[in-house]
Amino acid sequence: MKLSAEGTVMASSEEAAQLSCDTSSSHARNSKEQDFQPTQQIGSPTALGMGAFAIAFTTLSMSLMEWRSAAITNAYIGNCFFTAGMGLVLVAQWELVRGNSFGHTVFGGFGLFNLAFGAINAPAFGVADAFKDDPAALNNAIGYFLLVWGIFVLFFTVAAMPMNLVYTGMLGTSQITYTLLAASYFSFADDHASAGLALKKAAGAFGFVSGLFAWYTVGHLMCQDALLFSFPLGDTSPLYARLQRKKRH
């Protein structure tokens, strides 16, 4: 009985050891299989976002400059709501999933602006009708709206400076667009029609330049993926890296 018990214990120990070894081998195999499994990557939405921004900004800017007498911005409400409104908000969420906080903030900000600006200009929302007896108050209200958004875009511009010159130029000229357009509405509110018109056209000119920067970025991103070359963006990160090192020392 004693030998039998010892044999049983020894057999159990051997089985346990074998089970432990098999379990360890299984874990090792699973770990190796996981290591060799390709990670699933999410595609970049940046080109789509830049394209939507470029389309909305260049068309609106041409209207502000009154090219071919296209002075009525209501014609671009579709752009405001769908192309640059919903489109940029969706792109922003995509950037957030990829971990790009800057892209999420910029695309999301411009998307929300376009949705709000579209609502102001869309007759269905009744904004203009609410101020039909006091157009100066409407111009002042829109001026404040644009001025506050210009401040927001100014922070975008500062954040883009350590990245590259193209992003800085695009956001900087768009910030000037908001500021000049706000000044234009304030001038119209004060019955300075000629000054208001000049400021509006100047805002359109800066907005058009901002749109060109966006188109350039679209070309850079698309050629980078399809043709294996890209356009220079004017990388400023080395300059800011040197400035940070000097500041530390």
Curated annotation (Swiss-Prot):
It comes from the Eukaryota. It is a multi-pass membrane protein. GO terms for cellular component: endoplasmic reticulum membrane; plasma membrane. Induction: Expression is correlated with the production of patulin. Expression is positively regulated by the secondary metabolism regulator laeA. Expression is strongly decreased with increased sucrose concentrations. This decrease is lost in the presence of malic acid. Expression is increased with pH changes from 2.5 to 3.5 in the presence of a limiting concentration of sucrose, 50 mM. Natural phenols present in apple fruits such as chlorogenic acid or the flavonoid epicatechin modulate patulin biosynthesis. Keywords: Endoplasmic reticulum, Membrane, Transmembrane, Transmembrane helix. Disruption phenotype: Strongly reduces the production of patulin. GO terms for biological process: patulin biosynthetic process. The keyword RNA-binding does not apply. Patulin was originally used as an antibiotic and specifically trialed to be used against the common cold, but it is no longer used for that purpose since it has been shown to induce immunological, neurological and gastrointestinal effects. Genotoxic effects of patulin with dose-dependent increase in DNA strand breaks in brain, liver and kidneys have been detected in mice. However, more recently, it has been proposed that patulin might also have anti-tumor properties. Signal peptide: none annotated. The keyword Amino-acid biosynthesis does not apply. InterPro entries: AceTr, Gpr1/Fun34/SatP-like. The chain crosses the membrane at residues 42-62, 71-91, 106-126, 141-161, 169-189, 202-222. Pathway: Mycotoxin biosynthesis; patulin biosynthesis. It is found in: Endoplasmic reticulum membrane. One of its GO terms (molecular function) is acetate transmembrane transporter activity. Pfam families: Gpr1_Fun34_YaaH. Belongs to the acetate uptake transporter (AceTr) (TC 2.A.96) family. Acetate transporter protein; part of the gene cluster that mediates the biosynthesis of patulin, an acetate-derived tetraketide mycotoxin produced by several fungal species that shows antimicrobial properties against several bacteria. May be involved in the uptake of acetate, a substrate for the synthesis of 6-methylsalicylic acid by the polyketide synthase patK. PANTHER family: ACCUMULATION OF DYADS PROTEIN 2-RELATED, MARVEL DOMAIN-CONTAINING PROTEIN. This is Acetate transporter protein patA. It comes from Penicillium expansum. The gene is patA.
